[in-house]
């Protein structure tokens, strides 16, 4: 893709998200979402082939439906209140429709079907944008309307997302699908706490973006798209192998790594609000995610698949890909947990 065109597209994606996050007018929120959706289609189709074409079409149809629902909610809100302001409280009907629209944009269950299919059909760099940056705008609106969200609807979708995100990734060997199911599960954790403590949901989103970015950068650096190709990382980049081990375990939420921090705080917050069954189910289901990440870590770092002698000398050749940005990202994705006591300042 032409660098000038790519720069313009990326700037449009950023501008659309910034408009959604900063405006207080519902029509501008919708326009920001539309800019964001239309600008990312060329990014998804960067490597033109039938799979990326299919993925882009699925993404467009899903997001267009979500935008239609969002506009319906905005119009109903305008009829009831006579105002375009996002600070105005929503009535129950508008809140439910808007929550469903945002759930579709985020990939929450039962609107999660597009996430693994779209992520699998695109490049790793496009998948990184799809699973990180594209979550910012819907989460910011969910944050704004959190006081008026229907509690039971959101908790039902959140718990279903955590369950599906854990079960769906168990039988996968494609790394992009594993990351997609992990994203569904993480979105479930974030939206669970959104009503009780919206600030904690944003903190969870930040840690999720750090962990996912680090993982995708590792995949891109090693050109790995399957479990088998990742298992050959030891002879391409021996230094990166141990980093992959720690990042995978952190993404699975194993203490004392960074990924455990949001789970710990969310379970603590839910318990404070006299919710016992919900965090218990969530904690048990988190073991499913941890299992498939431990399986990835084991196949990458702790075992050696049968290979030819020629493969064992790959590490001697120079690698042109730079690791400058990856080092601080790996540190952030593994060592944030000791800072958790300082987060009491947010309350």
UniProtKB/Swiss-Prot annotation:
<feature type="transmembrane region" description="Helical">
    <location>
        <begin position="122"/>
        <end position="142"/>
    </location>
</feature>
<comment type="similarity">
    <text>Belongs to the complex I subunit 2 family.</text>
</comment>
<dbReference type="Pfam" id="PF00361">
    <property type="entry name" value="Proton_antipo_M"/>
</dbReference>
<keyword id="KW-0496">Mitochondrion</keyword>
<keyword id="KW-0520">NAD</keyword>
<keyword id="KW-1278">Translocase</keyword>
<keyword id="KW-0830">Ubiquinone</keyword>
<keyword id="KW-0813">Transport</keyword>
<dbReference type="InterPro" id="IPR003917">
    <property type="entry name" value="NADH_UbQ_OxRdtase_chain2"/>
</dbReference>
<comment type="subunit">
    <text>Core subunit of respiratory chain NADH dehydrogenase (Complex I) which is composed of 45 different subunits. Interacts with TMEM242.</text>
</comment>
<keyword id="KW-0999">Mitochondrion inner membrane</keyword>
<dbReference type="InterPro" id="IPR010933">
    <property type="entry name" value="NADH_DH_su2_C"/>
</dbReference>
<feature type="transmembrane region" description="Helical">
    <location>
        <begin position="274"/>
        <end position="294"/>
    </location>
</feature>
<keyword id="KW-0249">Electron transport</keyword>
<feature type="transmembrane region" description="Helical">
    <location>
        <begin position="25"/>
        <end position="45"/>
    </location>
</feature>
<keyword id="KW-1133">Transmembrane helix</keyword>
<comment type="function">
    <text>Core subunit of the mitochondrial membrane respiratory chain NADH dehydrogenase (Complex I) which catalyzes electron transfer from NADH through the respiratory chain, using ubiquinone as an electron acceptor. Essential for the catalytic activity and assembly of complex I.</text>
</comment>
<dbReference type="GO" id="GO:0005743">
    <property type="term" value="C:mitochondrial inner membrane"/>
</dbReference>
<feature type="transmembrane region" description="Helical">
    <location>
        <begin position="237"/>
        <end position="257"/>
    </location>
</feature>
<feature type="transmembrane region" description="Helical">
    <location>
        <begin position="325"/>
        <end position="345"/>
    </location>
</feature>
<dbReference type="GO" id="GO:0008137">
    <property type="term" value="F:NADH dehydrogenase (ubiquinone) activity"/>
</dbReference>
<dbReference type="InterPro" id="IPR001750">
    <property type="entry name" value="ND/Mrp_TM"/>
</dbReference>
<keyword id="KW-0679">Respiratory chain</keyword>
<dbReference type="GO" id="GO:0006120">
    <property type="term" value="P:mitochondrial electron transport, NADH to ubiquinone"/>
</dbReference>
<keyword id="KW-0472">Membrane</keyword>
<feature type="transmembrane region" description="Helical">
    <location>
        <begin position="96"/>
        <end position="116"/>
    </location>
</feature>
<feature type="transmembrane region" description="Helical">
    <location>
        <begin position="3"/>
        <end position="23"/>
    </location>
</feature>
<dbReference type="Pfam" id="PF06444">
    <property type="entry name" value="NADH_dehy_S2_C"/>
</dbReference>
<keyword id="KW-0812">Transmembrane</keyword>
<feature type="transmembrane region" description="Helical">
    <location>
        <begin position="200"/>
        <end position="220"/>
    </location>
</feature>
<dbReference type="InterPro" id="IPR050175">
    <property type="entry name" value="Complex_I_Subunit_2"/>
</dbReference>
<feature type="transmembrane region" description="Helical">
    <location>
        <begin position="149"/>
        <end position="169"/>
    </location>
</feature>
<protein>
    <recommendedName>
        <fullName>NADH-ubiquinone oxidoreductase chain 2</fullName>
        <ecNumber>7.1.1.2</ecNumber>
    </recommendedName>
</protein>
<feature type="transmembrane region" description="Helical">
    <location>
        <begin position="178"/>
        <end position="198"/>
    </location>
</feature>
<feature type="transmembrane region" description="Helical">
    <location>
        <begin position="59"/>
        <end position="79"/>
    </location>
</feature>
